[in-house]
Every structure is written in C-alpha cells, then in structure tokens.
Amino acid sequence: MRRAAALAARDEAALRTLMHPALQWTTFRNDVLGYEEYVAGNTRGELMWRAQRLDDVRVTVVADTAVLTAWVTDEVTRDGRDLEFRVRLTQTWVRTEQGWRCLSGHAGAPVGPPAG
C-alpha cells in the first residue's frame, strides 16, 4: 500500500526506497522497465497516478522473499485523459538491510474496456 501512496503522490524518494535497484518491471504494455525508467516514468512523466486499489491480495513469504498477487484498479491521467483500468498484478519483494523492496513486478493486460 505504501507503493500505491507513493505513486499517487509522485514521491520519487519513497519509490526509490521501496523499489530495489535491480528492479525489473513488466508493464501491461509489455515494456520491461529498470529501476531508473520505472521511477522516472511514475514521478516525472506524462502519467499521473490518482489512485490505486488492490483487491484479493495474496502474499506468500519464504525466508527473505515475498510474492504478492492481487487484482489492481488503477486511476490515472495520461495525455490529459482520466483513465481507469483493472489488471492482475504480481510482485516479488526481497528483505534487505533497508527493509522490504520490490525486485520485480508484472502487470497483466487490462480486463474490460478502459473507463474515462
């Protein structure tokens, strides 16, 4: 939930703390972003997050690794248009000396037509 709040606030410092420097993030558009691309695209780009809600959250923890799956509803503004879409999300988190950090994420294709 801290990641969702950081996205909506465009809080670059918080995202840098939450995301692992070796991050590999696959977007629903099938683009694979590294750490710098992910942070910049979510805090300085044309994409503005308004809200993100997670439903049916499931977490499995084994030692210093956690896998989260959820249905996610994203509310964003892109190119001046308000959009809302729902995707299946998988994240892998690892416990580090700095706390839990997201090492990888994958957002599936949006379900249903975008609203907005």
Residue positions per predicted region:
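Hydrophobic/aromatic beta-strand elements that line small-molecule binding cavities or substrate pockets
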Residues: R3, Y38, L54-T60, V72-D74, ...
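A solvent-exposed, acidic/Ser-Thr-rich amphipathic alpha-helical stretch
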Residues: E12-V62, L83-F85
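Short beta-strand segments enriched in hydrophobic/aromatic residues
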Residues: M19, V72-D74, H106-A109
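Beta-strand residues in well-ordered beta-sheet regions across diverse protein folds
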Residues: T26, T69-W71, L103
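Short beta-strand edge/turn micro-motifs at domain boundaries
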Residues: R86-P113
